[in-house]
Amino acid sequence: MENFIGSHMIYTYENGWEYEIYIKNDHTIDYRIHSGMVAGRWVRDQEVNIVKLTEGVYKVSWTEPTGTDVSLNFMPNEKRMHGIIFFPKWVHEHPEITVCYQNDHIDLMKESREKYETYPKYVVPEFAEITFLKNEGVDNEEVISKAPYEGMTDDIRAGRL
């Protein structure tokens, strides 16, 4: 797992949604969403479960304060990932509520989860191509430290950020 921890990745799902993740340590991630249903959302210090399934294959899973469940299988050597996201009904119907720096709005996420319907879940199972991969070390607070903006992933891939 030591080669996986510290990984900073940008990946694009087959449906076109572009995400960025930093495996901060063995139990925490930071991420930004650059396109898709909740583009503009970003989160730091999300508690996760990380396991090595077999050589070169890692699973990262978590439940968010929104009630969204996520399970991602990374195959960095293959530049592939398979993810499945279980969005609660309310997130699918009101995604704009979640498009923020979640850490500053945890109470709003919990209130919305209680206020709106959560079922049926909107399930998104997709493969993705990893388009950027760099090990940034453990607990690097600079990797994901600002809101996503138009062209950010191009800046990261070009080394400008």
Curated annotation (Swiss-Prot):
Substrate binds at residues 11, 13, 41. Optimum pH is 5.0. GO terms for molecular function: carboxy-lyase activity. Changing residue 41 to A: No ferulic acid decarboxylation. Changing residue 64 to A: No ferulic acid decarboxylation. It catalyses: (E)-4-coumarate + H(+) = 4-vinylphenol + CO2; (E)-cinnamate + H(+) = styrene + CO2; (E)-ferulate + H(+) = 2-methoxy-4-vinylphenol + CO2. It is an enzyme of class 4 (lyase). Homodimer. Involved in the decarboxylation and detoxification of phenolic derivatives. It is able to catalyze the decarboxylation of ferulic, p-coumaric and caffeic acids. This is Phenolic acid decarboxylase PadC. The lineage of its organism: Bacteria, Bacillati, Bacillota, Bacilli, Bacillales. The gene is padC.
